[in-house]
Amino acid sequence: DRQGAEFLRKYGHDGNYNWYFALTREGRPLVQPYNIFSYTFAAMAFAQVAVATGSDEYAMIAKRTFDRILEKRANPKGEWCKAYPGTRSLKSFALPMILCNMALEIEPMIDKQLLADTIGECLHEVMEVFYREELGLIVENVTEDGRLSDTFEGRQMNPGHSLEAMWFIMNLGVRLDDRALIDKAVKIALNTAEYGWDKEYGGIFYFLDRKGAPRVELEWDQKLWWVHIESTIAMIKGYQLTGSKECQEWFGKLHEYTLSLIHISEPTRLDVIS
């Protein structure tokens, strides 16, 4: 809404559209603008408020923020990056993945050719670099030249992240009228759900290791809420777009598992595709 947008317009960035990670309620910066996802969500938010209100200023903020994101793509954290340069340089799936989603949200504000180029580059990264045909799955980190890395970070698998990305890709497939892209995203989503599902206790693991080794993250086996929300969205969207029986079955499985762990007085059952 305008009240939230005005607060962020005044206090959310440093004047050059570098967006702080956190603020006090009075608007004073708490955390430096190190996180590129503060920028991506700001761009999406201001783009949508601009569409809703017709504000040229909000549209400009979305556009300027998008430009900053593109400038920072090669080194998103900039001066706040903790990694020592040149030792084990990896690139992350997270940025091209979120740009696939952001592209559709800010489309009205962006030059058509720039938007097309950005979408093309991000689709290539997500579906040809981070997606590994030999695994049938998406990896979280690769070397700067796109190779697998036999390191803790390089072997990290994040099923929820991959499933979230696949419904972004399905949306792009609709926008581009690309049936093959939609079908590929559905195939990857199904592979990922099968891979990430805990066969003993149910639910999708937070992190896994590409080679089956123990993970370093203490929370690797937790069943996080967002993982199951994104997975459910991916499956219902896959079913909607393709009629896939497997997507329908996975939607039901994920939905029932998730609601079995949520304690509310009147649980809601979605029977629309049962």
PLM feature segments, named:
Residues 17, 21, 34, 78, ...:
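Flexible, active-site-adjacent loop/turn segments at secondary-structure boundaries
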Residues 21-28, 81-87, 141-147, 204-213:
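Short linear capping/connector segments at secondary-structure termini
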Residues 68-97, 102, 129-148:
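Short, flexible helix-coil linker/hinge segments at the edges of structured domains or between repeats
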Residues 134, 144, 152, 158, ...:
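Short glycine/serine/threonine-biased micro-segments
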Residues 1-16, 61-78, 119-137, 185-200, ...:
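Long, well-ordered core segments of solenoidal/helical folds
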